[in-house]
């Protein structure tokens, strides 16, 4: 399975937070899964850390590498798709994740039920 982690899912995984459900844990830990972390997620975390609004690992990039997650860059196509999405969700980072999941044929692991309103395949976190 090709999985894209929503920001909170990445942070829950790294913290071994019990908020992360069993289905999501199984998908992430499955050796047959390719697990992607978007540049948008890293950007969101770094912005919120700098503003003092979020506690996250100070070595986030190292943690992504240690977990063998694959980085997913943002492209012009992703940006255009994110901007053209219906207004179900106004968070620009979440809209980017939806666009990336659509364009790259990824399953989005998220705890946000609004994400599925875009028609992208999701797994509840």
Predicted feature residues:
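Short glycine/serine/threonine-enriched helix-capping/active-site loop
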Residues: 37-38, 74
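Phosphate/NTP-binding elements of NTP-utilizing enzymes
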Residues: 45
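Short, well-structured N-terminal submotif of metal-dependent ribonuclease cores
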Residues: 1-37, 50-62, 104, 113-117
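Active-site neighborhoods of divalent-metal-dependent phosphate/nucleic-acid chemistry enzymes
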Residues: 57-61, 69-114, 120-125
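A generic structural signal for short
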Residues: 12-13, 48-49, 85-86, 100
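Helix-loop "lid/cap" segments that line or gate small-molecule binding pockets
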Residues: 48, 65-68
């Amino acid at each position: 399975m090709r999985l894209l982690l929503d920001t909170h899912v990445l942070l829950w995984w790294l913290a071994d937070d019990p908020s992360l459900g069993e289905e999501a844990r199984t998908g992430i830990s499955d050796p047959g899964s390719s697990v992607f972390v978007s540049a948008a997620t890293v950007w969101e975390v770094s912005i919120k850390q700098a503003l003092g609004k979020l506690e996250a690992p100070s070595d986030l990039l190292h943690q992504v590498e240690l977990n063998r997650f694959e980085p997913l860059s943002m492209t012009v196509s992703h940006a255009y798709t994110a901007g053209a999405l219906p207004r179900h969700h106004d968070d620009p980072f979440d809209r980017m994740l939806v666009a990336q999941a659509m364009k790259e044929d990824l399953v989005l692991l998220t705890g946000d039920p609004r994400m599925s309103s875009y028609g992208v395949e999701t797994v509840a976190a």
